Amino acid sequence: MESVLNFLTNINVIFTLLGYLIGGIPFGYALMKIFYGMDITKIGSGGIGATNVLRALQSKGVSNAKQMALLVLILDLFKGMFAVFLSKLFGLDYSLQWMVAIASILGHCYSPFLNFNGGKGVSTIMGSVVLLIPIESLIGLTVWFFVGKVLKISSLASILGVGTATVLIFFVPYMHIPDSVNILKEVGTQTPMVLIFIFTLIKHAGNIFNLLAGKEKKVL
C-alpha cells in the first residue's frame, strides 16, 4: 500500500497525469455543444479538432465557422503548451517535460472526458513541443500554416508540419543553441519527437491513403 501511495504522490506521476487531463479538455466538443447544440463526435470524421469543427459548421451554413475553428485550434494548441509550461514552472527534468507533452497529446486523442475518443492531436502536438524545441517547432508551425493556407489540405499540412519539426531535430541540436532547448544534449536522443511523428502518421493513416488516391478533401 505504501509503495502505491508513493507512486501516486510522485511529482513526475502527478504532472504526467495532469498533462493527460489538461490535454483531454475537449474544447471543440464543448464549444460546439454550448454554442450550436451539435455533437461534433457524431459529425464528419468524429474528430474534435479544428478541421472537423470547420467542416461541420460550414455544412450548416454558419457564418462564423472559420472564426470558431480558429478558436478551437488556438485552445488545443495552448492546452499542450500550458501542460508543458507547468512542468517547467515546477522544475521537472527536461526528459520528464517530454513525458508531460506526450501525455497531453494522448489526452487530446483519447480524452477521458469523451470515453477516450478525441482528435488527431496536431494542434496539441505543436503546442506541447514549442517550449521544448522552439526553433524546430516554430519552423514546423510555419510549414503547417503555409501548406494549409496554400493547398488547403489539412492532413497534408499537419503531416508536413510535424514532419518538418522532426527532421530538424537531427540538425538544429548541433547548432549553437541553449542546452535547455537542445533535445540531444538534455535527453541524448531524438526518440520522443520521432515517436510523436510516427503517432501522427498512424492517426492520419486514412488521410494518407486518401491523399495517395487523390481523394482527400480540401478545407475551404
Curated annotation (Swiss-Prot):
GO terms for molecular function: acyl-phosphate glycerol-3-phosphate acyltransferase activity. Its EC number is 2.3.1.275. The keyword Transmembrane applies. GO terms for biological process: phospholipid biosynthetic process. Keywords: Cell inner membrane, Cell membrane, Lipid biosynthesis, Lipid metabolism, Membrane, Phospholipid biosynthesis, Phospholipid metabolism, Transferase, Transmembrane, Transmembrane helix. It is found in: Cell inner membrane. Its main location: membrane. It catalyses: an acyl phosphate + sn-glycerol 3-phosphate = a 1-acyl-sn-glycero-3-phosphate + phosphate. Pathway: Lipid metabolism; phospholipid metabolism. NCBIfam families: glycerol-3-phosphate 1-O-acyltransferase PlsY (TIGR00023). Probably interacts with PlsX. Belongs to the PlsY family. PANTHER family: GLYCEROL-3-PHOSPHATE ACYLTRANSFERASE-RELATED (PTHR30309:SF0), INNER MEMBRANE PROTEIN YGIH (PTHR30309). This is Glycerol-3-phosphate acyltransferase. The lineage of its organism: Bacteria, Pseudomonadati, Campylobacterota, Epsilonproteobacteria, Campylobacterales.
